[in-house]
Each structure stands twice: as C-alpha cells, then as structure tokens.
C-alpha cells in the first residue's frame, strides 16, 4: 500500500509526459509570459523616461523662478482673484509656478493661464515627446531585432537536439530579462533587458510551435491546438499593457516585473516536470534546409502576411501612447488600457478562427483579416479620446487574430505538403516574419511620425496591408510535393526522394504519427 502511495507521483508524472494536452499547456504558458513581458513595458517606458529624464532635466529651470513666484501666489489678493473666476486654488498653484518662468508674475497673466492649464499641461515637453518616438521605437524594436538574428540558429538546433532543451533555455533567459526590467533605472539597462528578452523569446516561440506541430499531426487538430496556443499569446497581450499601466501608477515600476518573474518560475517548474529538458531528442528525419524553405514562394507569401499584419500593432506600441499624451492629455493608466480592446478581440479571434478557418478556408480568413487590419489602422487617427479608440483597436485585434490563427497552421501544412515533416525551421521562419514586423514597425514608425505625423503613418501601413491581401489567394490550393518539380525545379528531385525515403523510418515520439506521443515525453 505504501509503495502504491509513494509511486503515485511518479506515475502521474509519467502520464503527464505522455499527454499532448500538457504539452499544449506548457506552450500556452510560455507564450503567455513572453507576450505579457512584451506589452507590459508599452505604457511604462514612455512615462518612466518622461518622468526620469525630462522632468529631472528641467527641474533646475523651474526651481529658481518658482520661489519668487510662489511668494506672489500666496498673497490673499491672488487667491481671491482665482476664487472669483471659479478656479480652485489647489489646481492653479500646481501649474502656475511652471508658467511663471515665461511671465512677469503679475496678477493678469495667471487669469489667462488658468483657462488654458489643461492645454499647456498636455503639450508640456512636446519636443521631448517627439524625440522619444525614435528612442522608444528603437527600444521596442531591439527585442524583435535580436529575435530575428537568433531564430535562424534556433530552428536547425531544434532539429538536432529536440524541442525540450531550447524551451527551457528560453525560460531561463526570459526570467533573467524580467528581473533586469524590474531593477533597471536607465535607458541603457532597459535596452539590454529588452534585447535579452528577444533571445529568450526566440527559443520559446520556435521550440514551442515546432513541438505543437510535431505532436498534433492532423490538420484539423493542429489548427485547433495552434489557436489555443495563440490564445496564450493573446492573453499575454490582453493582460500586459493594462496590468503594467495600473501597477506602475499605483504600486511602482518594479512590481509588474517581479510578479512576472514569479510566474516565470512556475512555468520553469512545469517545464521541468513535463518536458524533461535534460533529454536530447533529435529528429530522426533530416529536415528541409532553411534556405530551401525560404525559396518556397508559398511559405514566403504566408510569412509576408504574418509580418505585415503584426507590423500594424507593432507600430502602434511606441507611437500610440505618445500620440495620446500629446493630443488627448491621457493619464498613465489610460495608455495601457487603450490596447485592451485589441487584446480582447485578438483573444476572441484566435480561438474562434482556430476552428472556423479550417471550414471556411484558411487562405480566405487570412485575406479578409489583412483587409480588416488595413481598415482598422486607417480609422485609428479619427479618434479624439480613448473611447474613440475602442472600435479601431478591437477591429485590429480581431483581424490579426484571424491572420495568425489561419497562417500558423498553414506553415506546418506547407511543410507536410511540400517538404520533410520537420517543423523547427518553418516555425523559425514564421517567428522571423513576426519579428520583422515588430522590428521594422517600431524602429521606422517613430522616425515617420517625426517627419509626416501619426495619422499619415497609419494611412501608409493600413494601405500596405490592403494591397498585400490578395496574395493570400495563392494559399488556396498549394501544389503537393509531387508537383514541386514545376515550382522549384532545382530542389524537387532531391527533396522528393528524401521525403519518400525517410518518412517510413521516422521514429521520434513527437513526430508525424498521431499515436506516437503516448510513447514519448
């Protein structure tokens, strides 16, 4: 009896390692934490840099004149005047010292300034905010740029050693990055933390999606699993920005990152129990080379759609909060909540079209999604307050959910159809496409905003998405591997023979046969 009780945890652990659902849970949690960390900094960084750099650099300018002006403001005659014009004394005294540096300190100027306090307060430091578009854009893009550089190495690495070790390496790097964000007080340290996040994200995303494609070999089941996993991504986007803005304003800068670090530890413990990351499990079949996959026009079309659709929200991350600070006088907590409709809609879109896209046609869902992305972006500059952003942002999130949940399974399907069924490299390409969008978007968006303004930036990226959308028609009926000779004449003979020869010998548990996972991890 005692032996049975003591052996129960080991038996449950063994069953867990054979469960496809628990593998899906591990990938879901990894994507959730990655994208929470991705978006939690969106409302924090602009206001944090504004508070630490702009206000500190201008404190000496305001400190001297404010002494003499404060003496004038505390006179009984002055307070009586402001009471006469229906302005509270407290509100006026907060803002007037900063304006007295440009006035004579007499009684009439405060009357004019009292009526324009909201406008002046909103536009204070406008030059600094415009310059911050570029710096913050580069900071946000650094994660995607590093991920872009690392992905080509992670894909082939997973083919050699399996998915488990890269997943755990990604967790450790993400944990270190989260701690750095919590205790970084300068732009340089934030940049290093963001770069580290890109490395960890590359390992987690490529290994996680490749693992799901290997476990769920049926096209319908794979689409559903990808939709659930992308739901973790969506939930991270959903929670990240509002969570970061609220915690930053009411608790402090470090608090959201410390909570994420604790959740990352739980994810690491889950990976240790389920994935057995000390075991090297290479693919028995040699995967198609990364260069060959990059020459496949159908994979390129799908990757381009992923890139451009996600570039829309990537451009909004650094530019929308600053635009709101300039035009809407938005407080800190609103900067994160502005992304809430997009995140909720993305969560709905990925889960809904993870199932529906297989029935409607994934190519059609991706086409409609890209058109909807373009239209939503065109509507963003029309908003005059945070409520006006609800519709465009919700449409944007839902449309990107359609695109991602449709095209991620297509990437695995194209490899099954036209190449060897080893998925590390193709999902490295998918992740590269995602990263290109998040690298080019923020880095160029800030520069474009400085030159032509935020509204025209939205027009440009929205129009590009609409123009690209018809290319998704080519994904309707891609030719199978037997037809590769007509598409890729140089690669066809070698790859077709390799696929035909290797398929019967494939023995990796997380591989092509749907019943194999029960004998694996």
From Swiss-Prot:
Location(s) in or outside the cell: Cytoplasmic vesicle, Secretory vesicle membrane; Cytoplasmic vesicle, Secretory vesicle, Synaptic vesicle membrane
Membrane topology per record: Multi-pass membrane protein
Biological process annotations from GO: aminergic neurotransmitter loading into synaptic vesicle; cellular response to lithium ion; negative regulation of serotonin uptake; positive regulation of dopamine secretion; serotonin uptake
Activity: how regulated: Strongly inhibited by reserpine, ketanserin and methamphetamine. Also inhibited weakly by tetrabenazine.
Segments on the Lumenal, vesicle face: 43-135, 186-194, 248-253, 317-332, 384-394, 441-445
Expression by tissue: Adrenal gland.
Catalysed reaction, written as an equation: serotonin(in) + 2 H(+)(out) = serotonin(out) + 2 H(+)(in); (R)-noradrenaline(in) + 2 H(+)(out) = (R)-noradrenaline(out) + 2 H(+)(in); dopamine(in) + 2 H(+)(out) = dopamine(out) + 2 H(+)(in)
Classification via Pfam families: MFS_1
GO cellular component, one term: synapse
CDD domains with a match to the protein in the record: MFS_SLC18A1_2_VAT1_2
Cytoplasmic side: 1-21, 156-164, 216-224, 277-296, 358-362, 416-419, 468-521
Functional description taken from the UniProt entry: Electrogenic antiporter that exchanges one cationic monoamine with two intravesicular protons across the membrane of secretory and synaptic vesicles. Uses the electrochemical proton gradient established by the V-type proton-pump ATPase to accumulate high concentrations of monoamines inside the vesicles prior to their release via exocytosis. Transports catecholamines and indolamines with higher affinity for serotonin. Regulates the transvesicular monoaminergic gradient that determines the quantal size.
Family: Belongs to the major facilitator superfamily. Vesicular transporter family.
Protein name according to UniProt: Chromaffin granule amine transporter
Protein encoded by which gene: Slc18a1
């Amino acid at each position: 009896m005692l032996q049975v009780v003591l052996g129960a945890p080991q038996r449950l652990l063994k069953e867990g390692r054979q469960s496809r659902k628990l593998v899906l849970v591990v990938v879901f949690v990894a994507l959730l934490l990655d994208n929470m960390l991705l978006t939690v900094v969106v409302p924090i960084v602009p206001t944090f840099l504004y508070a630490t750099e702009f206000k500190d650099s201008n404190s000496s300018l305001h400190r001297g004149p404010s002494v003499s002006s404060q003496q004038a403001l505390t006179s009984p005659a002055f307070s009586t005047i402001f009471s006469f014009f229906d302005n509270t004394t407290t509100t006026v005294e907060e803002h007037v010292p900063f304006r007295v540096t440009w006035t004579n300190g007499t009684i009439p100027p405060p009357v004019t300034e009292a009526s324009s306090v909201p406008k002046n307060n909103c536009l204070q430091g406008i030059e600094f905010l415009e310059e911050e578009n570029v710096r913050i854009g580069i900071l946000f893009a650094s994660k995607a740029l590093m991920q872009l550089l690392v992905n080509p190495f992670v894909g082939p690495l997973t083919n050699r050693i399996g998915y488990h070790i890269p997943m755990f390496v990604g967790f450790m790097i993400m944990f270190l990055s989260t701690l750095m964000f919590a205790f970084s007080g300068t732009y340089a340290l934030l940049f290093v933390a963001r770069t580290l996040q890109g490395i960890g994200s590359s390992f987690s995303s490529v290994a996680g999606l490749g693992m799901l494609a290997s476990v769920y070999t049926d096209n319908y089941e794979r689409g559903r699993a990808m939709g659930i996993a992308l739901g973790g991504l969506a939930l991270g986007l959903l929670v990240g920005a509002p969570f970061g803005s609220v915690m930053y304003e009411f608790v402090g800068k470090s608090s959201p990152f410390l909570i994420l670090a604790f959740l990352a530890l739980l994810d690491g413990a889950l990976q240790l129990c389920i994935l057995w990351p000390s075991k090297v499990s290479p693919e028995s079949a040699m995967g198609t080379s990364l260069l060959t996959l990059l020459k496949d026009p159908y994979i390129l079309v799908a990757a381009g759609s992923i890139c451009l659709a996600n570039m829309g929200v990537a451009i909004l991350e650094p530019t929308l909060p600053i635009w709101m600070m300039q035009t809407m006088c938005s407080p800190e907590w609103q900067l994160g909540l502005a992304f809430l409709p997009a995140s909720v809609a993305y969560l709905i879109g990925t889960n809904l079209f993870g199932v529906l896209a297989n029935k409607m046609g994934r190519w059609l869902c991706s086409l409609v999604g890209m058109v909807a992305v373009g239209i939503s972006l065109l509507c963003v500059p029309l908003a005059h307050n945070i409520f006006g952003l609800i519709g465009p942002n919700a449409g944007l999130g839902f449309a990107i959910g359609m695109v991602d949940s449709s095209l991620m399974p297509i990437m695995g399907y194209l490899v099954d159809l036209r190449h060897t069924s080893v998925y590390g490299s193709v999902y490295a390409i998918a992740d590269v496409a995602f990263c290109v969008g998040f690298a080019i978007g923020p880095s160029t968006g800030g520069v474009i905003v400085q030159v032509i303004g935020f509204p025209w930036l939205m027009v440009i990226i929205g129009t590009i998405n609409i123009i690209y959308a018809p290319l998704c028609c080519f994904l309707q009926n891609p030719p199978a591997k037997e037809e590769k000779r007509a598409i890729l004449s140089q690669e066809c003979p070698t790859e077709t023979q390799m696929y035909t020869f290797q398929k019967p010998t494939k023995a990796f548990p997380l591989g092509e046969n749907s019943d194999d996972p029960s004998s694996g991890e």
